[in-house]
């Protein structure tokens, strides 16, 4: 099954590293990066919302790399155009994201590499004279049924020039 994927433009590419510009988008966010946070969001897209509307899953799933972070799904473009339903669960925040630029490192494998990848990105940003804004973000593209060695991930830092 193919999922709608969040669109972006690649401004620069160097090996595994890309500078990406994301157009404005809408995300639904839960304050827990764990399985329980995923379940809260999944219930929203399964119809537990103000319109009882089922919403297609999208990729990637955004997660904060901190233990006390968040998990977020992006809203499909068609649902945004038609008007998305309000969340009934108070643990869900629906947020409009403005256009943003990120430096991203893509890889396949375990999320255990995240700290190493963040260091690689930070060195890249420092060498290019870019400024980081906010905390690192981990993007996940496959679910738990895919063996970890085959899972695609992006680690991103929001940047300003």
Predicted regions and their residues:
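A solvent-exposed interaction/effector surface
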Residues: 1-161
